[in-house]
Amino acid sequence: LAALRGTRVGLADNWLRHVHDVKLRHRRRLDHLSVAEQEDALISWLINSPARVKFLVTSVMFFPDNKDNGTDAWKAFPEQRLRILDTIRKHRIKNVIVVTGDVHGSLTSRLRHSEDADFEVQTIVSSPFCNSALLPYASASSFILDQPLAQTESGDYHLEWTSKVISQDNFAYLEVEREHIRVEYRDRDGEHLYSVNLPLQL
């Protein structure tokens, strides 16, 4: 309210203005890019980046798919998602970690390929920090796990849980080590809820 009225409460108004400015600046940069240009840039980065671990951050779920019929996740863009996954598999890109949220629950999972034992993409979901009473928390039964994420002539992409689903307010703390990424889920007070080590491909 203070920010809307233009009054100052500590640094809150400056922080809110900064977030708004950054949002507008990035929106202006992205608005002139077509979807194809953005996808090409992502694929080029995945192929050419020398980083040993590549964090792909997206505001909506990449996988697993939610059982609801919403259109605000990658589930609504299966062809584009498949092109990205096929790029990772065909170029044998290791240690791609998708970081996302927006499902009112937190979890980790791994995507494998039925005909390629070396293929692996992991996801870390961290959501929500403060949920509304109007929005139910996600649970394991909220997601589609009994069928492949995608089926192609070369094989199926299928999911595996690598953690339980955290169905309460929380945030994730990540530590990247040589052999694994440690994911710690903590409650709003910073108290430990659950942790898991996600192995990295060496």
Language model regions located:
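Long, structured stretches of catalytic cores involved in phosphate-ester chemistry, encompassing
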Residues: L1-L202
